[in-house]
Every structure is written in C-alpha cells, then in structure tokens.
Regions:
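NAD(P)-binding Rossmann-fold cofactor-contacting core
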Residues: 1-16
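Short acidic-hydrophobic, aromatic-tinged amphipathic segments that line or gate anion-handling sites
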Residues: 18-28
Length: 187
C-alpha cells in the first residue's frame, strides 16, 4: 500500500533522523544496496535472489512457525528469503545451527531439504572471526545471516545498549555482587 509506505517512511525518518525512501518494488530496494535487511512476518519470499548484486549482505529476521504448520494452523513455513538467495550466498551464517533442525526456518530448512544448500556449509555467528569460519574472503561475495534462535550475542548487544542509554540518562541502580573469592567454591 503506497500510503502505508509513505507514512512509515515519514514517521521513522523523523524518529531516527535518517532518510527513509518509500519504494514500489523489491528491485528498487535491492539495486545498489550494500545491506538488505528483512524483518517481516511473511511466508512468501520478499524478492527474487537473482536480483542480488555482488558484495551484498542479506539478513533475514523472521522467526519460525513450524509448530503452527505441523499442527495444521498454517500451510507453509515463514520465510523472507527464497531458495535462489540461499543458493547464491557465498557465506551463510545463523545464530545456532541446531535451530535449523529444531525450528525448521523455511529460509534455510527448505533449500536444505531440496538439496540446494548443505547444512554443513552453514556457520554459526560465534564462529565468525575464528578458524572455524573463513568469513568474507572477497568484497564480491554475497553473505547471508539468518537470525535463528539460540544465541545470546544479539541479546548481549541489546542489553549493553540499554545499559548505556540508562547510564547516560541517570537511570537505574548499581548492584553490588560478591567478589569471586567470597563465593562458595563448591556448589
């Protein structure tokens, strides 16, 4: 809906003091963007992975609804990203690989089921910057992060930001904890 897009852009441009431009098509968003961040509640992929350009990073935020699908309340898994995006990604990272098996996010589980990508080729967020994950090895690589459950990295970042804002605003209370040497050694 053009009015919703325009109203959203106006409201959040003012709120965050950034320019938000409403567009008509996914192609307009993807073309020339360094980062494509998806945060919806859809069960239909948002764009065709063939539109991706070298060097782009994609993040998919949508959570799983696999239990609703298995119990018959929904006919398909939620997914923002299509199979082609998963295929084209040179590096795929999720928060915790195990959640691909337990939560079955459509964005990754379906391409794995179809044999388009391999579970073993997906890295965990905590592996980035270690010998376990090569990370981006070329500026031309397309990278994809699927925000799955099960990793406190994002929670820690949010908590740190909340702490900084509260501290800057003079809010909150400082709690004293026992020093490690004062704690019982056996539990």
């Amino acid at each position: 809906d053009p009015d919703n897009r325009r109203n959203f852009a106006e409201k959040y441009s003012k709120r965050f003091n950034v320019e938000i431009v409403p567009v008509e098509t996914p192609e307009e968003v993807i073309r020339g963007s360094d980062v494509v961040h998806c945060a919806t509640n859809t069960s239909v992929p948002l764009f065709d992975g063939n539109l991706l350009e070298p060097g782009q990073h994609i993040t998919g935020m949508i959570g799983s609804n696999v239990q609703l699908v298995k119990s018959g309340y929904r006919s398909s898994r939620r997914r923002e990203i299509d199979d082609r995006t998963a295929e084209r990604a040179d590096l795929i990272v999720c928060n915790l690989r195990e959640t691909i098996l337990t939560e079955e996010p459509g964005d990754l589980h379906e391409p794995i089921e179809k044999g388009l990508i391999n579970f073993e080729d997906i890295y965990e967020l905590g592996e980035l910057g270690t010998d376990l994950c090569p990370g981006r090895t070329s500026d031309e690589q397309i990278t994809y992060h699927k925000n799955t459950n099960g990793n406190g990295v994002a929670d820690l970042g949010i908590a740190m930001r909340a702490y900084e804002l509260a501290k800057d605003d003079g809010r909150g209370s400082w709690l004293e904890f026992a020093e490690p040497e004062d704690l019982p050694q056996e539990i």
